[in-house]
């Protein structure tokens, strides 16, 4: 936690008033609507916690909400995540909501609000939507009331932090051969893109698509810390997700930046494939969905928007995704190599089901004795720079390495 969170909180009574306004006036108006999949004892405990809240018995409510969280946490961590019933995720969200509110009932310092925001984020990350996405609204109120953080200046026109991870390293920048370079077009008409790239499944870099996005001028380390620094996010730790020592952990964006970007950490940290813009709508206001997504079959709400934020040297191993992808580069540069789905045999996918969409080959240092066909497989490559939008067709194999401190936004669509 950064030092400024110990400062006295400004207007705690205003904070409580703003939070309380998000809830119904009476307990009877707040509907839990839990299904029979939730144990009767847990449903009873949650209703008791709710009653304690509306009676103003904050300490008792806090204890009850923590009991709800402990029990539902066990349910969330039993078996594969895909098998966790949504009802238990809703129970967890209710527990997070009540604990968050109790922590903010009479906070004396901003540390209490920062802890409340951490709990709220846990509900957003691990729970399911309740009461019209109330946790999103609570998080927005909490952020508004936290004092502005004092971060070192690091704007887009200033030098980035002087660490090895933030400097350009010419020796680490691969050569892109002209006849193997991804083609570039500047804002082609929709039908031209559809006919020549979408339908035949050909990669292309679209220039100018993101020029008008506010993030292209606003985003910097300082800005990201100011908007999202106190938010809890999942971070991948390790060089590649295929490595045995790879893991995931939860930390605030500030902690991530200080540990993995501003410092020389032993491991590589990567805020990867996270729906950050659903968690923090303030950042979503700085981006737009590319117009070309309208050529898809799905609705706009079905487009998955992910953030990819990390230091120089983060790697996404050669893999393929089932959906069309627009990868927009906002900060820094990335080296990307692409192989057609027709070359699947030559990239040697893992044989296990969980990694069947990932190649066994280390793209930039291949073991050709073990994978002899790989060197013969044709590919395209590029250096993706700020403002570039790369179209990666569905099931196209792609390998990504960041050459600088980097922030990318991906749009997966059908």
Swiss-Prot record:
One of its GO terms (molecular function) is peptidyl-arginine 3-dioxygenase activity. Its cofactor is Fe(2+). Residues 1-107 are annotated as: Interaction with RCCD1. Pfam families: ARM_KDM8_N, Cupin_8. Keywords: Aminopeptidase, Biological rhythms, Cell cycle, Chromatin regulator, Chromosome, Dioxygenase, Hydrolase, Iron, Metal-binding, Nucleus, Oxidoreductase, Protease, Transcription, Transcription regulation. The keyword Iron applies. GO terms for biological process: circadian regulation of gene expression; fibroblast proliferation; G2/M transition of mitotic cell cycle; in utero embryonic development; negative regulation of DNA-templated transcription; positive regulation of DNA-templated transcription; protein destabilization; proteolysis. Transmembrane segments: none annotated. Residues 152-173 are annotated as: Disordered. Fe cation binds at residues 319, 321, 398. A protein binds at residues 236, 273, 316. Coiled coil: none annotated. Residues 269-414 form the JmjC domain. Binds 1 Fe(2+) ion per subunit. GO terms for cellular component: chromosome; nucleus. InterPro entries: ARM_KDM8_N, Cupin_8, JmjC_dom. SMART domains: JmjC. Its EC number is 1.14.11.73, 3.4.-.-. Can form homodimers (via JmjC domain). Found in a complex with RCCD1. Interacts (via N-terminus) with RCCD1 (via N-terminus); this interaction stimulates H3K36me3 and H3K36me2 demethylation. Interacts (via JmjC domain) with H3C1. Interacts with FBXL3 and PSMD2. Interacts with CRY1 in a FBXL3-dependent manner. This is Bifunctional peptidase and arginyl-hydroxylase JMJD5. The gene is Kdm8.
């Amino acid at each position: 936690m950064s030092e400024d969170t110990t400062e006295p909180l400004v207007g705690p009574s205003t904070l409580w008033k703003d939070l309380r306004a998000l809830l119904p006036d009476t307990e009877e108006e707040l509907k839990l609507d839990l299904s029979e999949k939730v144990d009767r004892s847990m449903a009873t405990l949650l209703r008791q916690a709710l009653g304690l809240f509306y009676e103003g018995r904050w300490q008792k409510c806090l204890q009850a909400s923590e009991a709800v969280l402990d029990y539902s946490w066990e349910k969330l961590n039993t078996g594969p995540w895909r098998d966790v019933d949504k009802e238990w995720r809703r129970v967890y969200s209710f527990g997070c909501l009540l604990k968050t509110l109790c922590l903010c009932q009479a906070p004396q310092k901003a540390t209490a609000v920062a802890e409340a925001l951490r709990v709220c984020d846990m509900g957003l990350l691990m729970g399911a939507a309740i009461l019209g996405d109330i946790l999103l609204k609570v998080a927005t109120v909490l952020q508004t009331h936290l004092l502005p953080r004092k971060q070192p200046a690091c704007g887009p026109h200033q030098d980035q932090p002087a660490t090895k991870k933030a400097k350009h390293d010419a020796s680490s920048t691969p050569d892109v051969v002209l006849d193997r370079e991804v083609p570039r077009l500047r804002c082609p008409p929709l039908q031209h893109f559809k006919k020549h790239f979408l339908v035949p499944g050909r990669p292309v870099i679209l220039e100018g698509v993101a020029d008008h996005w506010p993030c292209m001028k606003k985003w910097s380390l300082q800005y990201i810390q100011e908007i999202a620094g106190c938010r809890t996010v999942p971070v991948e730790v390790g060089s590649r997700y295929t490595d045995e020592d790879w893991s995931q952990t939860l930390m605030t964006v500030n902690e991530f930046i200080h540990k993995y970007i501003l410092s020389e950490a032993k491991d590589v940290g990567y805020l990867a494939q996270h729906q950050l813009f659903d968690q923090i709508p303030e950042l979503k206001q700085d981006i737009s969905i590319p117009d070309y997504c309208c050529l898809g079959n799905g609705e706009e709400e079905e487009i998955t928007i992910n953030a990819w934020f990390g230091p120089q040297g983060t790697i996404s191993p050669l893999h393929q995704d089932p959906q069309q992808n627009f990868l927009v580069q906002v900060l820094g540069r990335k080296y990307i190599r692409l192989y057609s789905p027709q070359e699947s045999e030559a990239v040697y996918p893992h044989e296990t089901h969980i990694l069947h969409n990932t190649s066994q080959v280390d793209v930039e240092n291949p073991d050709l004795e073990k994978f002899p066909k790989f060197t013969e497989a044709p590919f395209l490559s590029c250096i993706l720079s700020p403002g570039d939008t790369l179209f990666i067709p569905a099931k196209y194999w792609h390998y990504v390495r960041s050459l600088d401190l980097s922030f990318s936004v991906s749009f997966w669509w059908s």
